[in-house]
Amino acid sequence: MAEPGRYHHLTVIEEQPHGLYLDDAEGGKVLLPRKQIPANSAIGDVLKVFVYLDSDDRPIATTLRPKAQLHQVAWLNVVDVNQTGAFLDWGLAKDSFVPFSVQKQRLEPGKSCAVYLYLDNTGRIVASTKLNRFIKDEVASIWPGEPLPLKNGDAVKLFIAQRTELGYKAVVNNEYWGILYNTDIRSAIRVGQKLDGFIKRVREDKRLDLMLEPAGHEKADPLAKRIL
């Protein structure tokens, strides 16, 4: 089965009144509802779709773009709360679910929160506000003796997660925590924002200091102005 919570390139193998069936590459098929079908699609075409579970927990495909996919952090709005948990708008027909057991604090309709999307032990896509369960404090090699996956100056993707006295805690590449210090911030940013950034320093304790501009940017700008 095509893994739920991710984008896949799947081949159209059958057409029915209610939509197209796509080959899930493992001997099964997944439905793309008719209202989601791109114009002029035909059997044999390969379509880029996002696969998730419908209200009956059956795999279903969509051409809509969710606000996040599996193993990513996102800033989502709470649309409802019931006796089992909270529901978040992630851009698809079926809302993302946050069980009470993985809520750092109780969520309320109309509020927004940072969440991490993962598969629970039943195979459902769920969200958690307990980011520390998934985001690592320290970078580490995949295998002993190998270089660290990040080094000083590397370009990275940042998710601004929390304001602190020092600046902002940010999630780096959906995997590690890092600190963006006040002294390295030159324009307004906000919690929930996604930004391009850089590794300022991999510290001796394997934690990450971050910056929003490449190293040497401050020195280069005045020189560039003089040349112009």
Language-model features: where?
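Single-stranded RNA-binding regions, centering on S1/OB-family and related RNA-binding modules
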Residues: 1-228
